[in-house]
From Swiss-Prot:
NCBIfam families: PRK04208.1. Substrate binds at N123, T173, K177, R295, H327, S379. It is an enzyme of class 4 (lyase). The gene is rbcL. One of its GO terms (biological process) is photorespiration. RuBisCO catalyzes two reactions: the carboxylation of D-ribulose 1,5-bisphosphate, the primary event in carbon dioxide fixation, as well as the oxidative fragmentation of the pentose substrate in the photorespiration process. Both reactions occur simultaneously and in competition at the same active site. The active site is at K175, H294. It comes from Pinus thunbergii. Mg(2+) binds at K201, D203, E204. The basic functional RuBisCO is composed of a large chain homodimer in a 'head-to-tail' conformation. In form I RuBisCO this homodimer is arranged in a barrel-like tetramer with the small subunits forming a tetrameric 'cap' on each end of the 'barrel'. This is Ribulose bisphosphate carboxylase large chain. Binds 1 Mg(2+) ion per subunit. The disulfide bond which can form in the large chain dimeric partners within the hexadecamer appears to be associated with oxidative stress and protein turnover. Keywords: Acetylation, Calvin cycle, Carbon dioxide fixation, Chloroplast, Disulfide bond, Lyase, Magnesium, Metal-binding, Methylation, Monooxygenase, Oxidoreductase, Photorespiration, Photosynthesis, Plastid.
Length: 475
């Protein structure tokens, strides 16, 4: 290159490495109604100031890189950069703090959770200057949430489709989760639905394995629910898992489910991916299918307190991507879930407007501007003795799902379903009469046992079953 045309480092911009905080830490910034706001729990490496660590998060999740580049001069960084606008300590943690970051809306593609997460929870989580990083919450402005379809139908439309009101819905995951033939699987579905459940469910890892191919399962399950509907006079459903190795195969399964006339399909939204999930949600709305969502893999992402992403963020992402149900823990069962934290993200799933409430882990006020709500599903290690607590904790707009708590009944699947239905209706009646389920719940169940031998047998077999471990994710 001739000396006349050689680009000098001193011409046009000043090369080198600058502290992130000089550009991306802006405590004077006033957030806009259109900004996407994030609350990160940051654990910097020793010697890294909080302001520099917070600014690094803002930079690396938006426009920044490790050095100054000449193409910075071709755009407006002030318009597009993320900004760390506040830092606060974490009580009881000397090495951690909460960094609040504001992102301008133009950084993100409309209607794409995939693009949103690629920026905000992308490479920045491997940044060497940070020992750990956790995304605690996101504020999604109406100007962005309105670019999403959201749930295919929502809570009220689902109740209208099922013609079921005034109580939680009852479900059951078919067990053993793997190994049954399609015909035996369909038989278990029929027995549970005939006994009084509203739904049965494929487990998350039931896809199309050698022992039971998906098409055979779909056909036998459709036959089972049609037979149960005819006998009970109630609308029934089975969550047919459409999750597959490719989006094309997933859609093929959803289309076949619709052709069978079933009311609901299922997807593993984290292992399947947000792009696939959003596509399936759009298909379900267009074709009248409800969509049940399983959160398999969530604990890999959300269980550790100092690194990853809290489930409340995954819950918001699912509401935008689309789903009518999602598993949300139980508080009282075998899976992780502290009560206040769980109820915080349950409200974020169901309600239209949720106020900031740090006592429940909600860092920002969230306005969903009439986006349909999602039914939380309580599932995992629950049985009839848990029914009063579940009814009191989750209320009517929920699905209470008993797998082993139905199929483990000593008299069989149908009596197990009867026991759960009787226990639920007893709890709902007691609550409606003004009784305190938190205090009188066990007595309500014992009274119901007097006129339901199925419930009495269930109470006897599970009277000693408890899962008493401290939760990891506390506020």
């Amino acid at each position: 290159m001739s000396p006349k045309t050689e680009t000098k480092a001193s011409v046009g911009f000043k090369a080198g490495v600058k502290d992130y905080r000089l550009t991306y830490y802006t405590p004077e910034y006033q957030t806009k109604d259109t900004d996407i706001l994030a609350a990160f729990r940051v654990t910097p490496q020793p010697g890294v100031p909080p302001e520099e660590a917070g600014a690094a998060v803002a930079a690396e999740s938006s426009t920044g890189t490790w050095t100054t580049v000449w193409t910075d001069g071709l755009t407006s960084l002030d318009r597009y950069k993320g900004r760390c606008y506040d830092i606060e300590p974490v009580p009881g943690e000397e090495t951690q703090f909460i960094a609040y970051v504001a992102y301008p809306l133009d950084l993100f593609e409309e209607g794409s959770v995939t693009n949103l997460f690629t920026s905000i929870v992308g490479n920045v989580f491997g940044f060497k200057a940070l020992r750990a990083l956790r995304l605690e919450d996101l504020r999604i402005p109406p100007s962005y949430s309105k670019t999403f379809q959201g749930p295919p139908h929502g809570i009220q439309v689902e109740r209208d489709k099922l013609n079921k009101y005034g109580r939680p819905l009852l479900g059951c995951t078919i067990k053993p989760k793997l190994g049954l033939s399609a015909k035996n699987y369909g038989r278990a579905v029929y027995e549970c639905l005939r006994g009084g459940l509203d739904f049965t469910k494929d487990d998350e890892n039931v896809n199309s394995q050698p022992f039971m191919r998906w098409r055979d399962r779909f056909v036998f399950c459709a036959e089972a629910l049609n037979k149960a509907q005819a006998e009970t006079g109630e609308i029934k459903g089975h969550y047919l898992n459409a999750t597959a190795g490719t989006c094309e195969e997933m859609m093929k399964r959803a289309i076949f489910a619709r052709e069978l006339g079933v009311p609901i399909v299922m997807h593993d939204y984290l292992t399947g991916g947000f792009t696939a999930n959003t596509s399936l949600a759009h298909y379900c709305r267009d074709n009248g299918l409800l969509l049940h969502i399983h959160r398999a893999m969530h604990a890999v992402i959300d269980r550790q307190r100092n690194h990853g992403m809290h489930f409340r963020v995954l819950a918001k992402a699912l509401r935008m991507s689309g789903g009518d149900h999602i598993h949300a823990g139980t508080v009282v069962g075998k899976l992780e879930g502290e009560r206040d934290v769980t109820l915080g993200f349950v409200d974020l799933l169901r309600d239209d407007f949720i106020e900031k409430d740090r006592s429940r882990g909600i860092y920002f006020t969230q306005d969903w501007v009439s986006m349909p709500g999602v039914l939380p599903v309580a599932s995992g290690g629950i049985h009839v003795w848990h029914m009063p607590a579940l009814t009191e904790i989750f209320g009517d707009d929920s699905v209470l799902q008993f797998g082993g708590g139905t199929l483990g009944h000593p008299w069989g699947n149908a009596p197990g379903a009867v026991a759960n239905r009787v226990a639920l209706e007893a709890c709902v009646q007691a609550r409606n009469e003004g009784r305190d389920l938190a205090r009188e719940g066990n007595e309500v169940i014992r009274e119901a046992c007097k006129w339901s031998p199925e419930l009495a047998a269930a109470c006897e077999i599970w009277k000693e079953i408890k899962f008493e471990f401290d939760v990891i994710d506390r506020l």
